[in-house]
Swiss-Prot record:
Protein topology in the membrane: Multi-pass membrane protein
Keyword Phosphoprotein: no
Quaternary structure and interacting proteins, as annotated: The cytochrome bc1 complex contains 11 subunits: 3 respiratory subunits (MT-CYB, CYC1 and UQCRFS1), 2 core proteins (UQCRC1 and UQCRC2) and 6 low-molecular weight proteins (UQCRH/QCR6, UQCRB/QCR7, UQCRQ/QCR8, UQCR10/QCR9, UQCR11/QCR10 and a cleavage product of UQCRFS1). This cytochrome bc1 complex then forms a dimer.
Gene encoding the protein: MT-CYB
Location in or out of the cell: Mitochondrion inner membrane
Binding site for a ubiquinone: H201
This protein's name: Cytochrome b
Remarks, miscellaneous: Heme 1 (or BL or b562) is low-potential and absorbs at about 562 nm, and heme 2 (or BH or b566) is high-potential and absorbs at about 566 nm.
Membrane-traversing stretches: 33-53, 77-98, 113-133, 178-198, 226-246, 288-308, 320-340, 347-367
GO biological process: mitochondrial electron transport, ubiquinol to cytochrome c
C-alpha cells in the first residue's frame, strides 16, 4: 500500500514541495530566507486581518480607530505593533533574500527571478499603502509626495494623479481605496509566491558553489525542515524583542500627530526600508529624472541575468566580484542613511555620488570585473 501523502491529490503537492523535495546537501543558512518570508507573509495577513476588524477607513475616524485598537481592544497594541514591525522584518528578509540571489547567481533562473522582482514591487506597494492607513502626519504627507511623483509623467501625469486620489487632493476617497488595495494585495502576493515556488521547483534550488548538484541531493524533511524551524524561532525572537521592548524604534514620531493638510512636517520621509530608493529619487534635481531613477533602482534587478558575463555562476570563487558586491551593499546602507537626512550639504552630494555608484556597479563595474576574472582563469 503506497503512503497516502504520495497518492492523495492535495497531499502529493505538499509532499513534493516540503517533504520529499530533493534539495542540495550544501545549501547554507542564506537559503533559509524563503521560508522566513513565507512566515512574515503569514504573520502580516493574520495580524492585518484582526486589525481590519477594528479599523475604519474614514479620514475623520482612521487615526482614532488605530488609537482605539491600541487602548481598548484585547492585545490590540500587540497585534498593531506586530504588524508594523513585521513589515520591517519582512523587508530585512527580502533584502537578504535578494542579496543572496545576487551573490550566488540565482538570477540565472529567469522566471523565478523575475517573479521575485514582481513580488518585491508588490510588497513595496502594499507597505506604502499600509503606511498611509493610520492617517498620521507622515501617512498623509508621504501619500501626497509619493503619489504626486506620477504627475511627472508627460501629458497624462496630472490626470493620473487626480484619478488615483479620487479628487484634487489626498482625502477620504484616497484612504478608502488604499485600504481596499492594502487588504487585497497580500492575497495576490500569496498567489505570486505559489508561482515563484512553481518555477523554482521546475529547476531545483541553486547552491553556494553554483554547480549542478543533481548527484548530491537530500530530502527536504527532516534536514531542512529542522533548519528552517531554527530560523523561524530566531525571527520570532527578534520580532518579539522589537515589539515588546521598543515598538516605535523604526517608526516616525510625526505619525503620532493626526494628519493635518495645513501643516507640513519639517522632514517628509518614508519608512526606513524605502529610504535607499528615496535617496536616489532626491539625488536628481529633475522631477521626471528622479522618478525614472526611482523606478530603475528596483527594475534594474531584472537586468541581472543579462549582465551576467562570468563563466562561473556563483561569486564563491570570484574574490574581485565579492569585493564589488560588498561595496554595493555598503553603498545601499549609505543611501538608506542619506534618505533619512535633510536636503542640505554635505548630504546631497553624498547621495548623488552613492546613486551614481549604485547604477555604475550594477551596469558597468560588475560585468567588467566578470570579464577580467574570465581572463584570469586562462592565465
Amino acid at each position: 500500500m503506497t503512503n497516502t501523502r504520495k497518492t492523495h491529490p492535495l497531499m502529493k503537492i505538499i509532499n513534493r514541495s516540503l517533504i520529499d523535495l530533493p534539495a542540495p546537501s550544501n545549501i547554507s543558512t542564506w537559503w533559509n530566507f524563503g521560508s522566513l518570508l513565507g512566515l512574515c507573509l503569514a504573520i502580516q495577513i493574520f495580524t492585518g486581518l484582526f486589525l481590519a476588524m477594528h479599523y475604519t477607513s474614514d479620514t475623520m475616524t482612521a487615526f482614532s480607530s488605530v488609537t482605539h485598537i491600541c487602548r481598548d481592544v484585547n492585545y490590540g497594541w500587540l497585534i498593531r505593533y506586530m504588524h508594523a514591525n513585521g513589515a520591517s522584518m519582512f523587508f530585512i528578509c527580502l533584502f537578504l533574500h535578494v542579496g543572496r540571489g545576487m551573490y550566488y547567481g540565482s538570477y540565472t533562473y529567469f522566471e523565478t527571478w523575475n517573479i521575485g522582482v514582481i513580488l518585491l514591487l508588490a510588497v513595496m506597494a502594499t507597505a506604502f499603502m499600509g503606511y498611509v492607513l493610520p492617517w498620521g502626519q507622515m501617512s498623509f504627507w508621504g501619500a501626497t509626495v509619493i503619489t504626486n511623483l506620477l504627475s511627472a509623467i508627460p501629458y497624462i501625469g496630472t490626470t493620473l494623479v487626480e484619478w488615483i486620489w479620487g479628487g484634487f487632493s489626498v482625502d477620504k476617497a484616497t484612504l478608502t481605496r488604499f485600504f481596499a488595495f492594502h487588504f487585497v494585495l497580500p492575497f495576490i502576493i500569496a498567489a505570486l509566491v505559489m508561482v515563484h515556488l512553481l518555477f523554482l521547483h521546475e529547476t531545483g534550488s541553486n547552491n553556494p558553489s553554483g554547480l549542478i548538484s543533481n548527484s548530491d541531493k537530500i530530502p527536504f524533511h527532516p534536514y531542512f525542515t529542522i533548519k528552517d524551524v531554527l530560523g523561524i524561532l530566531l525571527l520570532i525572537l527578534i520580532l518579539m524583542i522589537l515589539v515588546l521592548f521598543s515598538p516605535d524604534l523604526l517608526g516616525d514620531p510625526d505619525n503620532y500627530t493626526p494628519a493635518n493638510p495645513l501643516s507640513t512636517p519639517p522632514h517628509i520621509k518614508p519608512e526606513w526600508y524605502f529610504l535607499f530608493a528615496y535617496a536616489i529619487l532626491r539625488s536628481i534635481p529633475n522631477k521626471l529624472g528622479g522618478v525614472l531613477a526611482l523606478v530603475s533602482s528596483i527594475l534594474i534587478l531584472m537586468l541581472f541575468p543579462l549582465l551576467h558575463l562570468s563563466k562561473q555562476r556563483s561569486m564563491m570563487f570570484r574574490p574581485l566580484s565579492q569585493c564589488t558586491f560588498w561595496i554595493l551593499v555598503t553603498d545601499l546602507i549609505t543611501l538608506t542613511w542619506i534618505g533619512g537626512q535633510p536636503v542640505e550639504y554635505p548630504y546631497t552630494i553624498i547621495g548623488q555620488l552613492a546613486s551614481i555608484l549604485y547604477f555604475a556597479i550594477i551596469l558597468l563595474i560588475l560585468p567588467a570585473i566578470s570579464l577580467i576574472e574570465n581572463k584570469l582563469l586562462k592565465w
